[in-house]
Amino acid sequence: MSELSYRRILLKLSGEALMGDGDYGIDPKVINRLAHEVIEAQQAGAQVALVIGGGNIFRGAGLAASGMDRVTGDHMGMLATVINALAMQDALEKLGAKVRVMSAIKINDVCEDFIRRRAIRHLEKGRIAIFAAGTGNPFFTTDSGAALRAIEIGADLLLKATKVDGVYDKDPKKHSDAVRYDSLTYDEVIMQGLEVMDTAAFALARDSDLPLRIFGMSEPGVLLRILHGAQIGTLVQGRS
């Protein structure tokens, strides 16, 4: 097998990715499969960090639209990401990995505070780092949190796993003639309003020259193939 094209990555998983065929919570079979994928990538020599959303448990923005205070809702959403991070930590540790959960909000009896230098040290020591609670601030999505953490740890690549196999010009579930892009610039994504991540996350990654690959993770071994240079999904990088 060829050498790795990327040595340090951050993988962003949605909370919904943990549900499987359910409509809420965590499917043990799904999280176990995802854990195997992550460990396979790490055993190949990559330093792996994770950010997991919380939408399978709670979505603050949705309840804010129904009248809940937005800041309160977002704080509840941050706690949901901590729950998912702990679940993934457990799944990874059962497979023999060394894992650290680091939170943007203080929950010291449950996990570590996020400290950039410590996070990098964990990765250098062969531990998988899971970053929870987004940026620690309301009004920012976990996509923005993933972009921020990827920049802070000096990741070579930000990966976002989605339900589809890349970025399309329109919703492929609704339009049979939808066309998938192999590559895009950040400016093209923002100008065309392609809603695969929020604009703040795209702008952060663009301004830091961080490449982003958006792909589907339903196929076993796909993460490892990307690390070895396979052109899977859509690569977003650079400016127009």
UniProtKB/Swiss-Prot annotation:
Catalytic activity reported: UMP + ATP = UDP + ADP
Q: What CDD domains does this protein map onto?
A: AAK_UMPK-PyrH-Ec
EC id: 2.7.4.22
Keyword Cell division on entry? no
Q: Does the keyword Lipid metabolism apply?
A: no
Which residues lie in coiled coils?
A: none
Summarizing activity control, the record says:
Inhibited by UTP.
**May I have one GO cellular component term?**
cytosol
Gene Ontology MF annotations: ATP binding; UMP kinase activity
Per UniProt, where does ATP bind? Answer: K12, L13, S14, G15, G55, R59, T162, Y168, D171
Alphabetical UniProt keywords? ATP-binding, Cytoplasm, Kinase, Nucleotide-binding, Pyrimidine biosynthesis, Transferase
InterPro entries found in the cross-reference section: AceGlu_kinase-like_sf (IPR036393), Asp/Glu/Uridylate_kinase (IPR001048), Uridylate_kinase (IPR011817), Uridylate_kinase_bac (IPR015963)
A GO BP entry: 'de novo' CTP biosynthetic process
Location in the cell reads: Cytoplasm
The highest taxon in the source lineage is Bacteria
Q: What class of enzyme is it?
A: transferase
Q: Which residues bind UMP?
A: G54, D74, T135, G136, N137, P138, F139, F140, T141, T142
Pathway(s) it belongs to: Pyrimidine metabolism; CTP biosynthesis via de novo pathway; UDP from UMP (UMPK route): step 1/1
Q: What does this protein do?
A: Catalyzes the reversible phosphorylation of UMP to UDP.
So what family is this one in? Belongs to the UMP kinase family.
Family matches, as HAMAP family: PyrH_B (MF_01220_B)
How the protein assembles, per its UniProt entry?
A: Homohexamer.
Protein name per its UniProtKB record:
Uridylate kinase
From which source organism is this entry?
Xanthomonas campestris pv. campestris (strain ATCC 33913 / DSM 3586 / NCPPB 528 / LMG 568 / P 25)
UniProt lists the gene as pyrH
